[in-house]
Amino acid sequence: GSPNSSENGGVDSVDYVTIASTGNAKDFGDLFLNSMTAGAGANPVRAVVANGKDGPAHSNVIFKVNIATLGDSSDFGDQNVSRQTHGACSNSVRMVFGGGGTPTKISSIETLLLASGGNSVPFGDLGAAKSSLGACCDATRAVFGAGIFHPETHTNNLEYINIATGGDTVDFGDLLDNSKTQGGTGFSNGH
């Protein structure tokens, strides 16, 4: 994450909360690089972070942590394309991330298998190049929404892919308004 929107390099901390109880977040460990504008996914065993930026530079590093054990991250692999402000989500098998900036806005979608380490691979394309988009998944479908086209035009478009097979996105409808910077999008580990 990043403590603010400046180019200060982000932070390397990982925190967690216990969903079954109330209370403040606690320290889980550290990423091995500072990170900001990253995307994340998880299955019941492993959480994975596809890095966005490390200071002013874009980073293609993918981190992993084992959910059951507190501790620092380790290397999972590399993104095919270094990107920031991308939409990312996962089901219990696969993580997908799409769009983002390099800093030029891009449309490509990549995937990785959560159970095994390794580099991400191409998996399809969004309908248009955009950054600052959100994503969410269930066991079958990954939905990407909102974002910013070039030049700084916001969109309310929703589009999806079949998470098992990939491919180019299909229109899924529209949000009620044009939105950007969909930080805080998430996923459920209940699938």
Q: What do these predicted regions represent?
A:
Residues 1-191:
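Polar, enzyme-active/binding microenvironments
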